[in-house]
């Protein structure tokens, strides 16, 4: 897509004058999102959300169901990126105790195949979910992860059928999430 990127993200510790990758695991990260208190950073790797806790130098896996062309956590599908110009659907509460995110189930969205040139002499194929007019879109749901209890809860959105959630943000009250 045009706006999303994958990269190796680095953390620079000013006090120790030390630079290291935000994750020791293989794979690049997407949409690093720092907590308001600066002690954590949430990011997406392989369609799953992870949190790096800087104070303890640990990495916590928030979601485990992410899968290419099926489930996206925290990042957006093609429609949201192209039509709403949004790639990040994760938000920290003001007290840094909760991480809200949108989950996309694109398993019923038809696949589109496109030729892509890479390192080889001939192009390969890139397959991704692309709903044409009249086809099914991703099913979206909003979730909240507690950093303290490590529980994830699905939040009930009072809308039925096909709908979009292009923005989420916590209000100044850490118990209120605005879903737009």
Predicted regions mapped to residue ranges:
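Beta-propeller folds
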Residues: 1-180
